[in-house]
Amino acid sequence: MKNCWLQNKTVLITGGASGIGAGIARLLITKYACKVIAVIIDDTGLEQTVRELGENSGNFTCLYYDVSRYENWIKIKKYLEDNSVQVDILINNAGIFPAFGRFENVAKDELENCLNIDFYSVAYSIQVMYPHIGKSDTPAFVTISSSAALAPIAGTAPYTAAKSASKALTECFAFEHPEIYVGCVCPGFTKTNLFSRQKEDISKNKLISAFMSKRDRMVKKIVHGIKRKKCRMIYGADARLMGFLFKFFPKSFPRFFRWIMKISKQPMFEDVFIK
């Protein structure tokens, strides 16, 4: 463990109060003695995260900012430097998943909100934080994208577009800076509150839940991948399968998946098929 490059690092993570972000924060703190600074917009899930950290909660702090605003990243950078905090690793994890529906029916505000949080927050943070993190002995940038970036799914146009863009941006940034570690994660469906905007409570849907990975299992895979400095991380059987099928069957797979969604009669997919 002493030789692990993650040991005793200072990590800045967006969306670290709950879900995958909170899980990553907890594992980095408890296993690698990291100090984690979570950038969050509200306290949703925070109490449980602090409780799970227990005596290690002293290594977990929060900054309250809307990460989709460029000027807030300027403020975050200034706060860190004014307080002599050197961040080693930036993990872009914040994200929202709008309800399934046809693209032409997506409200302008909802479209902009999804793009701002799922894509622009990644772009802004990397641009602003690069000069600061570049001063670290072990600078690293990690983006939590999605399996949606591997294969398009009917009803997810804003989310898929934003996550695909964040994946592409991260990989381009990696090619521009081979001297630092840049990783991109494409996790499959995971049991978190990401799906809170859907028409039904996914946690109570046994059919959908059966295809979802447990959060802590997904977190362990992600952190292990970061530990090994993997550039592209695709985790979850559904993510690997989606990527494979779309790669070799780019026309028939999306149609087949749409057909499965339709015959499943799941409430969360209803708006995809309403003309």
What kind of feature is each model-predicted range?
Residues 101-103, 107-112:
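Substrate-binding pocket helix/loop in short-chain dehydrogenase/reductase
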